[in-house]
């Protein structure tokens, strides 16, 4: 009955929204308190102000870390990129007189509102994507976009601010469109960082290993956090802005102009302006409706029981054109997801409400970046229009009323004890724990990772992949194989082949397990032992090969091994 009532209210409100949907809003700005009074959420939820001007500028992208802090890319300078004569160096690591920054917001007393702000990296040039992440040797850090590079900002001395600014990838395109740059950074399975490449810009991305990509306009790609490799994930879309994974490991995006949401299949091509497909057709569509908008920004996937069974497999989509947060229910037709329109999750009587990013924290709290403005269109209205607001921005916090109270501590990604999370019943938490161990391997996690891998169903391919990659990283640590007595573990045998250490070679020498379908197992095992094995291991393998060759008509395999060993 609640859904029927809510649906009726939604239908009644559509005409009102369309009537007020002008390119330049006719009303004036409201205070944060008055805007809050104009926002409506479903029964059972509460919305509150988390942060507003002057604590922040215009928020673009949001993220949370393991300590419950909210990271935000904040801009005042948009839409004008700082000229190169204001750059502190050729890389543009700092811009003079810039008010743009990556900020960290903290709710220290647990009342649901930020009471502490830190300009972690200031003097930036229209920052967009932000992902909290740091190397083990650093106190804090993030990966972020600031014209013209993807950066690693790190606090190395513990003062709470970035004193290291290092280019990961770049320079990349920004000159044609400052609202179509790199954004929506997400840490995914296997330790890759996924990102969107926006409308109209062209970028040639070169990684440290020599791999490169040329991207024009909308695309999604992924890269290693250290910039060692870059790969295209999917091609097309017009101006994707927003990425989200579901519990199965599927990746979804929000796009402007083509469709509000896509499931992104690796290697697939999606509709864009004037771009053909690759001859195989476009990736499957999952949505037929448009939510009455050409401008969609931000997406959050609800699953894993985070809001209860009635909210399982739903997506929330930011709609800054209609000043709403849309809702779709996802069902699967075979392996293809389909989106069915539901009543809007958030509506507003204030047409300045501009939700441009959504972030669902691990504790179930939804954060919304509100680019509060009279004008939202980048092309539809001149950039120098006096109605463009340059000072107001809000972040809203939405939580279920049931069990509301003090903020939970987020003890998953980046925790000192991710092993505990490996035994969680939530696949999302297990995947995040595996990702944490990829970045910070721990010797004591080898056995729990093997247990988690053995207990994970074969059909959960993304979680199994994350666990295998985490196990590979942990097995590179000295002594990691010392407590493994089993010699018939086929899964471990396949992983050990990717571990370039003498310990791995010694274990493989006595390994009896053969990975299923591994027709090239024997030559790969020999090559690994010859390259990484100690002299004792090489001698043992040579004796093994000679003994085997004595029973054959020729010693071809032994000769081949000797050639490998001498290489």
Where are each of the predicted segments found?
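Secondary-structure boundary/capping signal
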Residues: 8, 128, 228, 269, ...
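A subset of signal/propeptide-processing and intrinsically disordered low-complexity segments
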Residues: 16-17, 455
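Secreted/periplasmic carbohydrate-active enzymes, especially glycoside hydrolases
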Residues: 2-5, 140-142, 422-423, 464
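Long, ordered, helix-rich scaffold segments
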Residues: 369, 386-391, 398-567
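Low-complexity, intrinsically disordered short segments enriched for Gly/Pro and polybasic residues
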Residues: 1, 16, 563-566
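Generic recognition of cysteine residues
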Residues: 6-9, 142, 256, 474, ...
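Bacterial N-terminal signal peptides
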Residues: 4-16
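Beta-propeller domains with acidic blade repeats across secreted/periplasmic ectodomains
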Residues: 19-418, 428-432, 436
């Amino acid at each position: 009955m609640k859904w029927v009532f809510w649906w009726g209210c939604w239908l009644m409100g559509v005409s009102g929204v369309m009537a007020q949907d002008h390119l330049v809003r006719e009303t004036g700005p409201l205070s944060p308190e008055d805007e809050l009074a104009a926002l409506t959420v479903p029964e059972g939820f509460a919305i509150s102000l988390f942060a507003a001007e002057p604590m922040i500028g215009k928020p673009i992208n949001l993220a949370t870390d393991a300590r419950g802090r909210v990271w935000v890319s904040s801009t005042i300078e948009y839409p004008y990129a700082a000229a190169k004569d204001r750059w502190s160096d050729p890389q543009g690591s700092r811009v003079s007189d810039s008010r743009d920054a990556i900020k960290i917001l903290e709710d220290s007393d647990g009342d649901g509102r930020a009471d502490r702000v830190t300009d972690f990296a200031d003097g930036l040039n229209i920052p967009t994507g932000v992902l909290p992440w740091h190397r083990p040797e650093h106190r804090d850090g993030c990966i972020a976009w600031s014209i013209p590079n993807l950066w690693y900002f790190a606090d190395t001395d513990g003062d709470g601010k970035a004193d290291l600014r290092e280019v990961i990838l770049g320079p990349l395109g920004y000159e044609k469109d400052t609202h179509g740059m790199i954004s929506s950074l997400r840490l995914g399975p296997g330790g890759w960082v996924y990102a969107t490449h926006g409308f109209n810009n062209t970028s040639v991305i070169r990684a440290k290993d020599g791999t490169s990509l040329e991207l024009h306009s909308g695309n999604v790609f992924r890269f290693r956090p250290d910039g060692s490799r870059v790969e295209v994930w999917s091609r097309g879309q017009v101006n994707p802005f927003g990425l989200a994974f579901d519990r199965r490991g599927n990746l979804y995006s929000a796009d402007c102009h083509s469709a509000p949401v896509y499931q992104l299949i690796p290697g697939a091509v999606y509709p864009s302006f004037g771009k053909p497909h690759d001859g195989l057709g476009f990736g499957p569509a999952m949505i037929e409706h448009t939510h009455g908008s050409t401008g969609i920004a931000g997406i959050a996937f609800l699953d894993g029981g985070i809001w209860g069974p009635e909210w399982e497999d739903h997506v929330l989509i930011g709609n800054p054109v209609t000043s709403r947060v849309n809702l779709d229910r996802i069902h699967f037709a075979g392996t293809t997801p389909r989106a069915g329109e539901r009543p809007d999750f958030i509506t507003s009587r204030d047409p300045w409400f501009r939700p441009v990013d959504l972030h669902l924290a691990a504790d179930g709290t939804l954060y919304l970046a509100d680019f509060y403005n009279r004008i939202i269109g980048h092309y539809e209205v001149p950039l120098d229009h006096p109605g463009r607001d340059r000072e107001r921005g809000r972040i809203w916090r939405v939580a279920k009323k049931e069990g509301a109270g003090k903020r939970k501590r987020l003890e998953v990604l980046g925790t000192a004890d991710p092993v505990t999370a490996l035994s969680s019943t939530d696949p999302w938490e297990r995947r995040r724990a595996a990702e944490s161990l990829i970045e910070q391997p721990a010797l004591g996690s080898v056995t729990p990772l093997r247990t988690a891998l053995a207990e994970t169903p074969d059909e959960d391919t993304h979680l199994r992949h994350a666990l295998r990659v985490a196990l590979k990283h942990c097995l590179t640590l000295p002594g990691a194989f010392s407590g493994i007595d089993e010699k018939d573990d086929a899964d471990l045998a396949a992983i050990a082949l990717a571990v370039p250490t003498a310990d791995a070679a010694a274990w493989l020498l006595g390994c009896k397990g053969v990975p299923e379908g591994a027709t090239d197992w024997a030559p790969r095992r020999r090559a690994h032992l010859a390259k990484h094995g100690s002299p004792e291991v090489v001698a043992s393998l040579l004796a093994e090969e000679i003994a085997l060759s004595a029973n054959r008509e020729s010693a071809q395999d032994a000769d081949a091994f000797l050639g490998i060993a001498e290489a």
